[in-house]
Amino acid sequence: MKKIGFLSFGHWTPSPQSQTRSAADTLLQSIELAVAAEQLGADGAYFRVHHFARQLASPFPLLAAVGARTGRIEIGTAVIDMRYENPLYMVEDASAADLIAGGRLQLGISRGSPEQVIDGWRYFGYQPAEGESDADMGRRHAQIFLDMLRGEGFAEPNPQPMFPNPPGLLRLEPTSMGLRERIWWGAGSNATAVWAAKLGMNLQSSTLKSDETGEAFHVQQAAQIRAYRAAWKEAGHAREPRVSVSRSIFALIDDRDRAYFGNGREEEDQIGFIDPQTRAIFGRSYAAEPDVLIEQLRKDEAIAEADTLLLTVPNQLGVAYNAHVIEAILTHVAPALGWR
């Protein structure tokens, strides 16, 4: 394992038990947690993106703010729902945030997850083309986004512009060259992982996927990663791909940890449906003393296959506690798994 970061779902609720009671709380604490994680030596700060929910949504203002406050840590998403995105406008936003961060963005994109509303992308002005599903539309938006990130001119210039143009067709500005290689696809199935490999995207595999074989979650996820790497090699890309997996992992160090996570729940995979047609398997959580955690995680085949591990954090418990969660893993667990 080469890198470890955190993944925040960015929840807020007006409950008195929550440390994030407003959108402002969540946004500002997300920045502070990224700063704290960098100081602790973590490698990445990643954020979920959900629309129509009390969670983080359009991510680029947050990513830019984190980029301005940090200097080393990778900054990313897991994932942006491409059904909601104007891919050209997204190139401009993503490039601006990447330039502010000095080329540290790692953008996870996908077709999205189950929504809070029915066909929410329609309210954003998007419709699948005739014969397209909404998932097809998301993948089409993704391919346009990837093409535009190449930085090639495509727009006919005005012969009488307000400001002088460079020669030839014009491209989107700003375009951050190099960001194209730091785009990840959140794949929920083996087929979409292979598709992502062919297009030269890195792979994000989360805490759930389509249940394709009935095997344990980590076994299926490891097989997905191997299929992805084989497709990448077959495609003949010049660089090595990156692969991340997400896990809920808590080292029980003190009484707070045991009170929050020491109840033994969710220690087995769960089966459910992410839509009426798709049976899904949800990966287990891990919560134990560090020596027990190390042995459990060594048996996780997908963690062994990946180069990046994202720790899902309970952001509503506040910056100080989540920094403690990250530090406990980095100090007491990660070195035994080959990190650093």
Mark where each language-model region is.
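N-terminal beta1-alpha1-beta2 module of alpha/beta enzyme domains
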Residues: M1-I73
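Flexible, glycine-rich active-site loops centered on histidine and acidic residues
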Residues: K2-A23, Y84-F154, D211
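Conserved, mostly hydrophobic/aromatic
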Residues: I4, G41, V49, V66, ...
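Hydrophobic faces of well-ordered beta-strands that scaffold small-molecule active sites
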Residues: I4-S8, A45-F47, I75-A78, L105-I109, ...
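Active-site mouth loops of central-metabolism enzymes
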Residues: W12-L28, I80-P87, M177-A187, A280-D291
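Glycine-rich, proline-tolerant flexible connector loops at the mouths of alpha/beta enzymes
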Residues: G44-V66, T207-H218, L310-A323
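Alpha-helix-loop-beta-strand connector modules within alpha/beta enzyme cores
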Residues: L56-I80, E327-R340
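An alpha-helical appendage that flanks or caps ligand/catalytic pockets
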Residues: P128-L172, S205-S206, T213-D307, R340
